[in-house]
Amino acid sequence: MTELKEQLSLLGRKTEYKQDYAPEVLEAFDNKHPENDYWVRFNCPEFTSLCPITGQPDFAEIRISYLPDVKMVESKSLKLYLFSFRNHGAFHEDCVNIIMKDLIRLMDPKYIEVTGIFTPRGGISIYPYANYGRPGTKYEEMAIHRLMNHE
């Protein structure tokens, strides 16, 4: 347990909320079961960002699902990371792809998908979806299949 506490700098400590996009707050820890294929899912119902053109707030539920390999994302760091989008100007599709790419850089998962369920503005709701499967593996094929059969 001491080793795990040394790996993580946010959990169990006073929280500083970043006011702009801050991928550096993401932290990972070792997966105790990298030989197993299993889902880890996060549902983040209070995501906010800003429209890069109007500066108006956008609200969404962000859903993150992944098959971990050696590393896993620590949930408090993920919460703080997602909060850092609060004053960040980005289109919905950009937010989803940025989140996915940052998590790939952090963990190098076998497979990951991120969905944004954005609250309607102007009578239109946008639900961007992005996924990734590790190249050259069955997870790459899985990503293609899931993308082609998405909704």
Curated annotation (Swiss-Prot):
Keyword Oxidoreductase set for record: yes
A GO term for molecular function: preQ1 synthase activity
Catalyzed reactions: 7-aminomethyl-7-carbaguanine + 2 NADP(+) = 7-cyano-7-deazaguanine + 2 NADPH + 3 H(+)
Pathways involved: tRNA modification; tRNA-queuosine biosynthesis
Subcellular location: Cytoplasm
InterPro entries assigned to the protein according to its UniProt record, in alphabetical order: GTP-CH-I_C/QueF, NADPH_dep_7-cyano-7-deazaG_red, QueF, QueF_type1
Binding site for substrate: 73-75, 92-93
Main subcellular localisation: cytoplasm
Catalytic site: 51, 58
GO biological-process terms attached to the record: queuosine biosynthetic process; tRNA modification
EC code: 1.7.1.13
One GO CC term, this protein: cytoplasm
Highest taxon above the source species: Bacteria
Name of the top EC class for this enzyme: oxidoreductase
Keywords of this entry: Cytoplasm, NADP, Oxidoreductase, Queuosine biosynthesis
Family in the record: Belongs to the GTP cyclohydrolase I family. QueF type 1 subfamily.
PANTHER family per the UniProt record, alphabetical: NADPH-DEPENDENT 7-CYANO-7-DEAZAGUANINE REDUCTASE
Biological role stated in the UniProt entry: Catalyzes the NADPH-dependent reduction of 7-cyano-7-deazaguanine (preQ0) to 7-aminomethyl-7-deazaguanine (preQ1).
Protein name per Swiss-Prot or TrEMBL: NADPH-dependent 7-cyano-7-deazaguanine reductase
Organism whose genome encodes this protein: Bacteroides fragilis (strain ATCC 25285 / DSM 2151 / CCUG 4856 / JCM 11019 / LMG 10263 / NCTC 9343 / Onslow / VPI 2553 / EN-2)
Upper lineage: Bacteria, Pseudomonadati, Bacteroidota, Bacteroidia, Bacteroidales
Gene name of the record: queF
